Amino acid sequence: MSLSDADHELVVEEIGREPTRAEAALFENLWSEHCAYRSSRPLLSAFDSEGDQVVIGPGDDAAVVSLPSHGDGEEMYITMGVESHNHPSYVDPFDGAATGVGGIVRDTLSMGAYPIALADCLYFGDFDREHSRYLFEGVVEGISHYGNCIGVPTVTGSVAFHDDYEGNPLVNVSCIGLLEPERTITAEAQEPGNKLVLVGNATGRDGLGGASFASEDLAEDAETEDRPAVQVGDPYSEKLLVECNEALLDEELVESARDLGAAGLGGASSELIAKGGLGARIELDRVHEREPNMNAMEYLLAESQERMVYEVAPEDVDRVAELAERFDLGCSVIGELTEPGTNYVCTFEGETVVDVDAAFLGDGAPMNDLPSDAPPKQERDLPTVSLDEAFERIVSSPNCASKRWVYRQYDHEVQVRTSVLPGDDAALLAIREAGTGLAFSAGADPNWTDAAPYEGARAVALENATNVAAKGATPHAAVDCLNGGNPEKPDVYGGFKGIVDGLADMCSDLDVPVVGGNVSLYNDSQDGPIPPTPTLALVGVKEGYDAPPLSLSGEGRLVVVGDTALEGKTDPRLGGSEYTAQFGGTDRFPALPVDSTDVVETIAEVADADHVLASHDVSHGGLAVTLAEMVHEDAGASVEIGTTEHGTPARLLFNERPGRVVFETTDPAAVREAFDGVAPVTELGEANDSNGLDITVNDETLAYNVADIADLRSVIDDEL
């Protein structure tokens, strides 16, 4: 990818001459879609990023959000970040995914925080295809290797399979960091005369041009031709960098910081000084390297991993070098900050190779004004399938099957904060410093947003909010990773615009500020574009660290809240469902609750009540899959659903309208009272010790023992 003619003319007009080779490469990368958001930034103003809890919102390496404290708890902040490593994970699934983890962890470090939790949201082609399974295995291995080695637990996430990811999988990784308020730093340069210090791994040639590579469609030969653009990670160096960063903060040696990610040293250093309104003079010869004969462009743009650039006061430079040596990390004093109004200058072998205004380099790219086509609306055209066949196919589909094969590879209890483990609706982390439980949910459903981008994205936000509420937490803040195909195609851009608006509207309705995020476009290949995919990572807060489990106790009554179709008030729709993915057909997307905020807040309140023995949200696969996930060898369930004027048994059991939760409770009347005027409460039956699941709808019955259900749900384990 090279600088376009129009961009080249703009650069020449601004700087008054032809750019040097190094300058042209910098503009090419920093003005790429990956860095400049040229096609997406005009849409992102739809998001509400403000709130009393927001300390630092979008624009930095990670967002900073304050937590409520309980009891004798202290004031604490968390950082939230998310990034994509999509193209690299197709070319090299292990290293592509591993370095995605490393990058988002360093974004956390650059705010002064210590990383305490990861979430991975993964999207692949049809599970039946060998190439999809190869990518799946490699990505999971890369994430588990890197996360386990650095001691950061992967506690939640999602996995989805869809034909349209065959030529371009998605790997979205989110990180939560814990931060004492007084340790907060930013990526905004502070003071002329301060030094720029590069700490971490030596610089090589890996990852060259990674930002521009991520801004193009994947070519047919990408797995071989684009391998040099994929970074190679070293988690052991990352662990040392994490601890070195803590030591630097302990001694208050850091004025500002930036992770070296997209566009490498050139991107990190120019962005840092631009945010501070300063200039800089950098000597590229001073960069510690691991390969000989590197040129200026390679020093600037290599995306070698495990590197940070720090702003350090001159009197503190020697101490920073001592601490870096203690942790066996390289350290180079590469330059210094200069007065406002001066340029970003880089020299190499005594010659000036870059001399430009950092603000123009970082923010001068013109935005794209692209046409968009609204996605077509789908109408009902559904096949007739027996209830047993539908249940077995859907419960055993990779999208609804157990993901234990994935999360059992992760060390999800390191740091001893995880009180609700992977496999539940949301993870729950004990923030003992504040006396606060932090619920964490992340994911999206491509079936939803493929069928209806706007409505599906609203459902993604509601589902993640319902996940944390089902564990008794109130939604607090979110970050998003917006993935789309080639925005130059009007139908693709129309779908992308739909997910942006849908996610923004529902988060606003829920009063959840979207405090940061990432955009990944050009996820397109010879197989076509991906479905528009709005990954959301959302946290909720509660007092204490206990939550009702997903699994039944076998001792209570079962109720579902928010299921208006079972009450005969709405038409159950199968649009975007696993039912239509398995059997074909189309339908409209489910209508969502009118007042989602009241529903979610009441779910959180009820989930924390003493009479609640278990809780589980209803979403992927519908009510039947939710019940199948709740039964186990020690507890079964008997469910009977009466006749309604709306919906066949299949539509009642397999529609995926979010905002519903199944509670096992010893006091159904208390649940009904809590939801009076908020959402309907429908009694389903009882949990018991029958070792089976019986569901009767309109005189049709499903009857399975839990061993058979476990066998159906083990398809990923069985295959891999």
UniProtKB/Swiss-Prot annotation:
Monomer. Part of the FGAM synthase complex composed of 1 PurL, 1 PurQ and 2 PurS subunits. This is Phosphoribosylformylglycinamidine synthase subunit PurL. It catalyses: N(2)-formyl-N(1)-(5-phospho-beta-D-ribosyl)glycinamide + L-glutamine + ATP + H2O = 2-formamido-N(1)-(5-O-phospho-beta-D-ribosyl)acetamidine + L-glutamate + ADP + phosphate + H(+). SUPFAM superfamilies: PurM C-terminal domain-like, PurM N-terminal domain-like. Substrate binds at S84, H85, N86, H87, R106, Q231, E303, S304, Q305, S520. One of its GO terms (cellular component) is cytoplasm. Pfam families: AIRS (PF00586), AIRS_C (PF02769), FGAR-AT_linker (PF18072). Belongs to the FGAMS family. Mg(2+) 1 binds at E83, N518. The gene is purL. It is found in: Cytoplasm. Pathway: Purine metabolism; IMP biosynthesis via de novo pathway; 5-amino-1-(5-phospho-D-ribosyl)imidazole from N(2)-formyl-N(1)-(5-phospho-D-ribosyl)glycinamide: step 1/2. It comes from Haloarcula marismortui (strain ATCC 43049 / DSM 3752 / JCM 8966 / VKM B-1809). The active site is at H34, H85. It is an enzyme of class 6 (ligase). Part of the phosphoribosylformylglycinamidine synthase complex involved in the purines biosynthetic pathway. Catalyzes the ATP-dependent conversion of formylglycinamide ribonucleotide (FGAR) and glutamine to yield formylglycinamidine ribonucleotide (FGAM) and glutamate. The FGAM synthase complex is composed of three subunits. PurQ produces an ammonia molecule by converting glutamine to glutamate. PurL transfers the ammonia molecule to FGAR to form FGAM in an ATP-dependent manner. Keywords: ATP-binding, Cytoplasm, Ligase, Magnesium, Metal-binding, Nucleotide-binding, Purine biosynthesis. GO terms for molecular function: ATP binding; magnesium ion binding; phosphoribosylformylglycinamidine synthase activity. Mg(2+) 2 binds at D107, D259. One of its GO terms (biological process) is 'de novo' IMP biosynthetic process.
